């Protein structure tokens, strides 16, 4: 399942700065998070300890549950657990979140109400019953997840109707100038404004 692969890639990316972003030795110790930096209603299992070893263990559990979701093993339970761990991880350090993190959490939420393990999964292969579900499925969750993804494109198109995109073409330059979002390649491309 592609959603589980995205979760695994996200975990791998976050693991590169695990100590800096998720331990008490990093940029946001638990004491600072609890004292007002984060939302008081955000509860995170990652707040149980600020030790690096505990965070590594939580990342490993999150990864194992994501692998179970990818394989389609006990898909419903795996989806709920992956959503819980993803939201918990995001709540641990709200300073480093982007819109993609919110979208991932929402897609995982709606996936809890969809038959994610109905096809191409261990759950589907283990279904020994004579009754096989139809390939057609519609529910509120189906409409919601499609609407959620569709709105990303609609609002992106609306935002790109500004003259900065169509007349002077400087939007890409400005986007790559944001240090928090730009990668090494982005910083390199800033040396060639004619390409942008």
Language-model region placement:
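Alpha-helical membrane-anchoring segments
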Residues: 1-196
């Amino acid at each position: 399942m592609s959603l589980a692969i995205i979760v695994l890639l996200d975990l791998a990316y976050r693991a590169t700065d695990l100590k800096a972003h998720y331990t008490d030795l990093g940029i946001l110790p638990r004491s600072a998070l609890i004292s007002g930096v984060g939302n008081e209603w955000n509860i995170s299992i990652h707040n149980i300890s600020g030790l690096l070893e505990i965070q590594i263990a939580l990342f490993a559990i999150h990864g194992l549950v994501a692998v179970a979701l990818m394989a389609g093993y006990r898909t419903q339970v795996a989806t709920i657990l992956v959503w819980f761990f993803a939201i918990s991880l995001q709540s641990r350090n709200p300073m480093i979140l982007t819109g993609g993190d919110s979208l991932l959490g929402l897609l995982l939420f709606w996936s809890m109400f969809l038959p994610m393990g109905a096809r191409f999964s261990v759950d589907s292969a283990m279904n020994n019953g004579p009754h096989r579900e139809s390939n057609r499925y519609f529910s509120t969750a189906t409409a919601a997840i499609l609407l959620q993804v569709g709105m990303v494109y609609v609002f992106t198109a609306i935002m790109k109707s500004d003259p900065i995109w169509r007349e002077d073409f400087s939007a890409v330059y400005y986007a790559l100038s944001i240090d928090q979002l730009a990668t090494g390649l982005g910083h390199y491309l800033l040396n060639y404004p004619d390409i942008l």
